[in-house]
């Protein structure tokens, strides 16, 4: 079985493409079934395995398969599933085989490949991806072992380095950008759309600035109400957004909607009602919640996750020593995992050897039992049994030695000496 990771992320693709390749949570299980069965070869000697990790910054397919053409098949499947031409998608896709796939998984879970260096949210997202793959019946021995090692490495990296300390989160970056637009965030009205982990982080950071008002709008009213109350804010129905948008100076949105929830027309009306006072908008969702055309309006300052990434990277340089430590830990653990993977490759061979040897044993025992039943001398029967087993067990190695020549034969001889520890060397004339 070969490990393979196929994907795109914030390093290789803009948000405009990432949002088209993202998988809504409810689509992942059925997608895994088609991906595993159609493109990883259901007739393969070993059952193929697959997992999908889809976040705002990356979409990745983790595979374990015998199919040597899995790389091309995975890219083609991703293209067809999302109805994106292969020629448009392929230049942004990375394909990581074997140790590269292992190293990548370890780095992703440890926060080394994130836009926010050392962030912890990705680890929870990977665990969710594994849980979903397990429920879909798409996870097996290889990927299960990979992810368990991945989580252990992430824990080790975060526990022994300072990779996650003083990191600038997306939420903190949003506040910093708001401070560039408005002299005092404390004088502004803030609207947060959504009620997930990212919006919760934004609520924490914006509430710390003491805004004039903090309001949460969410599709599920009860959840939005609970979040608003935690930060002494108010909740409002998401349906009221088009008619009340003009009330807010700062709008941050991050929902799981597959389509934009804030359109150009609604923002145009809000700007007009505000008499062209500026609106600061942050779209942290992938796919995007706010139509990109909104950013072209004169009095609107619209930022996406990619825009916030530049601010986040400013805080990453100071933690390069921790990065070096983390990379060293990861490299050691990659080698450990590859050793385990190598041992797995010989398991079928060992199993076959046991099966063959046992078949020989049973055949000879059955023959011996028949001889004993007809009254043959037990000592002679046992001698014949042992001779037959000896001849048949060494037949394979002997035939192999006779078939090869030159350096191959010398290598095989050395290998056989390892099997039979007491085999005499060719220059040993002692006769022992």
UniProtKB/Swiss-Prot annotation:
Pfam families: GlutR_dimer (PF00745), GlutR_N (PF05201), Shikimate_DH (PF01488). Disulfide bonds: none annotated. Its EC number is 1.2.1.70. InterPro entries: 4pyrrol_synth_GluRdtase (IPR000343), 4pyrrol_synth_GluRdtase_dimer (IPR015896), 4pyrrol_synth_GluRdtase_N (IPR015895), GluRdtase_CS (IPR018214), GluRdtase_dimer_dom_sf (IPR036453), GluRdtase_N_sf (IPR036343), NAD(P)-bd_dom_sf (IPR036291), Shikm_DH/Glu-tRNA_Rdtase (IPR006151). NADP(+) binds at residues 194-199. Keywords: NADP, Oxidoreductase, Porphyrin biosynthesis. It is an enzyme of class 1 (oxidoreductase). Possesses an unusual extended V-shaped dimeric structure with each monomer consisting of three distinct domains arranged along a curved 'spinal' alpha-helix. The N-terminal catalytic domain specifically recognizes the glutamate moiety of the substrate. The second domain is the NADPH-binding domain, and the third C-terminal domain is responsible for dimerization. HAMAP family: Glu_tRNA_reductase. This is Glutamyl-tRNA reductase. It comes from Burkholderia orbicola (strain AU 1054).
């Amino acid at each position: 079985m070969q490990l393979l990771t196929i994907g795109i992320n914030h390093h290789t693709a803009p948000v405009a493409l990432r949002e088209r390749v993202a998988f809504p949570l409810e689509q992942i299980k059925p997608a895994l079934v088609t991906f595993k069965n159609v493109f990883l070869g259901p007739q393969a000697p070993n059952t193929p395995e697959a997992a999908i990790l889809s976040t705002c910054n990356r979409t990745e397919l983790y595979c374990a398969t015998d199919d040597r053409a899995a790389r091309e098949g995975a890219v083609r499947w991703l293209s067809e599933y999302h109805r994106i031409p292969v020629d448009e998608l392929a230049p942004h896709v990375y394909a990581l085989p074997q140790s590269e796939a292992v190293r990548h998984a370890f780095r992703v879970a440890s926060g080394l490949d994130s836009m926010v260096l050392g962030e912890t949210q990705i680890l929870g997202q990977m665990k969710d991806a594994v849980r979903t793959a397990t429920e879909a019946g798409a996870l097996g021995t290889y990927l299960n072992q990979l992810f368990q090692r991945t989580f252990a490495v992430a824990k080790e990296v975060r526990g022994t380095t300072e990779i996650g300390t003083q990191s600038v989160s997306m939420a903190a970056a949003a506040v910093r950008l708001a401070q560039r637009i408005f002299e005092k965030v404390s004088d502004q009205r803030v609207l947060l759309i959504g009620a997930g982990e990212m919006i919760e982080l934004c609520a924490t950071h914006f509430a710390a600035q003491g805004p004039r008002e903090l309001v949460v709008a969410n599709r599920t009213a009860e959840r939005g109400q609970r979040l608003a109350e935690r930060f002494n804010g108010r909740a409002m129905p998401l349906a009221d957004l088009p008619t009340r948008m003009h009330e807010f100076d700062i709008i941050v949105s991050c929902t799981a909607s597959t389509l934009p929830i804030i359109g150009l027309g609604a923002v145009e009306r809000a700007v007009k009602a505000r008499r062209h006072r500026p609106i600061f908008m942050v779209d942290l969702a992938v796919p995007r919640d706010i139509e990109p055309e909104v950013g072209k309006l004169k009095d609107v300052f619209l930022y996406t996750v990619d825009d916030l990434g530049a601010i986040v990277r400013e805080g990453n340089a100071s933690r390069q020593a921790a990065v070096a430590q983390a990379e060293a830990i990861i490299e050691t653990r990659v080698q450990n995992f590859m050793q385990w993977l190598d041992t797995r490759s010989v398991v079928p061979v060992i199993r076959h050897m046991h099966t063959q040897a046992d078949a020989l044993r049973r055949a000879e025992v059955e023959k011996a039992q028949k001889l004993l039943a007809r009254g043959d001398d037990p000592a002679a029967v046992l001698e014949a049994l042992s001779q037959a087993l000896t001849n048949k067990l060494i037949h394979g190695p002997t035939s192999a030695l006779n078939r090869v020549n030159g350096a191959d034969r010398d290598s095989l001889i050395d290998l056989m000496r390892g099997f039979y520890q007491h085999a005499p060397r060719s220059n040993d004339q002692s006769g022992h």
